[in-house]
Amino acid sequence: MQPCPIKPTDHLLPHSGRMVLLDEVLSYDDTSLHAVCTVRPDCILLPPDSPDALPGWQGMEIMAQGVGAWAGVQALDAGRPVQLGFLLGTRKLEFGVPAIPVGTVMDVKAVLSWLDNANNMGVFDCTLAVRTPPAGREAELPAGTLLLSGALNVFSPPNREALDAILGR
């Protein structure tokens, strides 16, 4: 097992630079992961016309990175390289807020619900909740406030050839 906390998280995800959104992994096991993400003023997902808050639906990418980090630590623990993964869709998506203000520190939790190793597909029940509210918003967004939850359907191609076939290359 990787010692926790794991910080930075870029080696767990097939992302780089500002696209890596998770600050650290606090804990993980065979079926779950708990990470932290801060909505920073330079967050790549912030819309130019509303730079003070992340649209709630963008939280799906943060939850997907929680799933990706889980897959990353599982791969590293097994001596395998980190693989590319895809968010296929969501179910039971529930928004606690329409937007997540800059400065919000969030708990990101992903719990494995179903895994098909033969086809490299899985379902994870995920949540984003306020860990630390942004300054001045403590009454509006107290710690523990559920921001977003849902079941994420994911797929990871087993190899480069399979990915090329999917992409029609």
Where are these regions (language model features)?
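RNA-interacting cores
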Residues: M1-K7, H34-V39, D52-A53, G66, ...
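Hydrophobic beta-strand-centered segment that forms part of the acyl-chain substrate-binding groove
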Residues: P3, A69-K109
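Short aromatic-glycine motifs in intrinsically disordered, low-complexity regions
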Residues: I6-S16, A139-E140
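Catalytic strand-loop segment that frames the active site of acyl-thioester-processing enzymes
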Residues: G17-P55
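Small-residue-enriched segments and motifs
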Residues: V20-D23, L88, V108-A110, G150
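Conserved positions in beta-strands of structured domains
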Residues: D23-L26, G96, V111-S113, N153
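Compact, glycine-rich, soluble single-domain proteins
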Residues: P51-A69, L84-G85
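HotDog/MaoC-like acyl-thioester-processing domains
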Residues: V102-D107, V111-R169
